[in-house]
A protein has these predicted regions:
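Amphipathic, Lys/Arg-enriched alpha-helical "gate/interface" segment within cytosolic domains
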Residues: 2-153
Length: 153
């Protein structure tokens, strides 16, 4: 594993929070990510997340358990702040596994398994609009080139 690879968090399009995972990460990197995520949750602001896991090869059982424990521990914050999360999962087998897990143990907020970044962004923008956040939804679409061009003439 490349020790310089890390989980990156981008809030430049807030209330869209983008998280990109490397092919592998350490437990320490996961704790740093969860600590930052908790900071966002404690703001009490509504947001939508995109988790880009297309590079991620696998996680350890310890990391999966830590993630589940974190979600359970902060379930009330997720319910009040998260408008939903789109997870980009490009492996059909991993996507199926994610859907089964979500079915067996539903997330505290809506979750969408996307096969690409445009699909995730489209879903995230729709979640923002459903919450009445039309300006941020348009800004997100514009940033990713997903706005239809207006015709004049």
């Amino acid at each position: 594993m490349d020790p310089s690879a890390s989980i990156t968090i981008d809030d430049s399009l807030w209330p869209l929070l983008q998280v990109r995972f490397p092919s592998a990460f350490t437990n320490s990197q996961q704790e740093q990510y969860l600590s930052r995520l908790l900071t966002y949750l404690r703001r009490g602001e509504r947001y939508v997340g995109i988790l880009d896991t297309h590079l991620l090869k696998n996680t350890t059982s310890e990391q999966r358990q830590r993630q589940a424990d974190f979600i359970k521990e902060h379930e009330a914050l997720f319910r009040s702040c998260s408008l939903g999360t789109a997870g980009i999962i490009t492996s059909p087998l991993m996507a199926l596994g994610a859907r089964i897990l979500i079915h067996l143990k539903p997330m505290p907020s809506p979750y969408y398994v996307a096969s690409s970044l445009p699909a995730a962004v489209t879903w995230a923008a729709e979640r923002l609009e459903l919450a009445g956040l039309f300006g941020p939804a348009e800004r997100v679409r514009r940033h990713f080139g997903l706005l239809a061009e207006r015709r004049t003439g």
